[in-house]
Amino acid sequence: SSSLTINGTKMIMLSCYCPRILVYIVDHFDECLGPVVIDGTFEYDLAVIGGGSGGLACAKEAINQGARVAVLDYVTPSPQGTKWGLGGTCVNVGCIPKKLMHQAALLGESIHEAVSYGWQVPSQQAIKINWPALTEAVQNHIKSVNWVTRVDLRDKKIDYINGLGEFIDPHTIVATMKNGSKKQLTAKNVVIAVGGRPHYPDIPGAIEYCISSDDIFSLGHPPGKTLVVGAGYIGLECAGFLNSMGYPASVLVRSVPLRGFDQQMARMITNEMEERGVKFHHRCIPLSVEKLESGQLKARWMNNETQTEHEDVFDTVLMATGRYALTKQLNLPAAGVTCVNDSGKVVAATEQTNVPHIYAVGDVLEGRPELTPVAILAGRLLARRMFGGSTQQMDYDNVATTVFTPLEYGAVGLSEEVAIERHGADNIEVYHGYYKPTEFFIPQRNIKNCYLKAVTLREAPQKILGLHFVGPVAGEVIQGFAAAMKCGITMEQLVNTVGIHPTVAEEFTRLNITKRSGKDPNPASCCS
């Protein structure tokens, strides 16, 4: 026999006497000992834990820079058993299916309005959603994206490990595979990109009977009358498209809707939804959810202002009370990485954690926008800094976003409240106005919540601090203005831009009334 030292462990070679044992050790070396580390080198230059948008963007850019890369991804089923493929929240249970459901709701409205435009619709009463057909179409699209993503990793020669990764030490990760087997690997650098999952309130029946945004897009039966607990953008978007599809929706609001967004615009969103039939229960917290013999759910809640309890029966209860980072399953203490206890989020100002070679991108970051494009760009820039010699940092300011409620809300920059807090009310000017989308005229749609404003510095040339827009296709409207904000656009430049007529986006170029003036912000004419 002879000996060999690997990773500081002395191994006895028994080839003379036990050849079969030696063959087994060689064939199953990773399972027995983990990867070989020789002369301080590692199997991979980068291991990315998490196969969502940010992690994948980082991995692909690292490969482009010549790095050896592995991606570990595993989806723990939701409490209701929902699971999905590679691609993260956005592709599977977030942006993509949400936008498709939103589009389905808008199409239903358009069919009803088509009569006003001269289309002959056989029977408006017959216009209703086929929920199984919708979810099947949505899921088929998602599966196609899962497949394309997997093939892309293969073509780029990124090692994909479909296992739940956790740290053993700062450079070593073990992945637990679906069949329970283990695979170890070492990496010089690690990126944590595991994202987050919906939070469930600690009340009776929440875990057992309620669904979340993880489940709604593949729900096997029509949701029926639905209670949405939570009034963040996820809750309002879900309540909005469900109600528009003909499923009555109610929303429990604990404090304010769309916390963190401009509150004047948030009120317009909820006003519009109420006028469309969504019920809002303000200042309320859930108490319990009970399953009845009929299969329906009895929900109880308390109004914190009146201290009165209320209850109602629903077919579905959807929890949208926030999200937590999936870092607890990573065994971060073994790597020395610190995180925020309550949320599990990682503090990393430049995506670098307190352990120099371990980074984080996406929804796991404390104090950063939980948005797919943010994670993608941050991941890409991080890979360029790690392997391409770049020094460019992610700019988290002036990130545009849109809430896809029935009447959409797009925003970029500061809310009016934050602008006043930072600069003082006397140093802020707010230009605002209502407008009438041309396509709303003939079907006589409600226009009283179609509104926009520009929050600027008061001193010339009045640099724009924030732009806010409630109306149709808000995301398409606000995207171009995000680039202008990046370039430091002023109010003078905005109003001297020639608009495209007739569009809703041109309304920003027509802003000329300030809140301070007290003048009527309603439009007098569409063409002057």
Descriptions of predicted regions:
Residues 361-418, 505-512, 516-523:
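A conserved FAD-binding loop/helix module that cradles the flavin
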Residues 194-215, 302-346, 364:
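Glycine-rich beta-alpha-beta "Rossmann" dinucleotide-binding loop(s) and their flanking helix/strand
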Residues 220-256, 260-261:
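Rossmann-like NAD(P)H-binding beta-loop-alpha module
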Residues 190, 315-319, 358-359, 363, ...:
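AMP-binding/adenylate-forming core of the ANL superfamily
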Residues 49-54, 58-84, 96, 100-106, ...:
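Flexible, glycine-rich terminal cap/loop adjacent to redox cofactors
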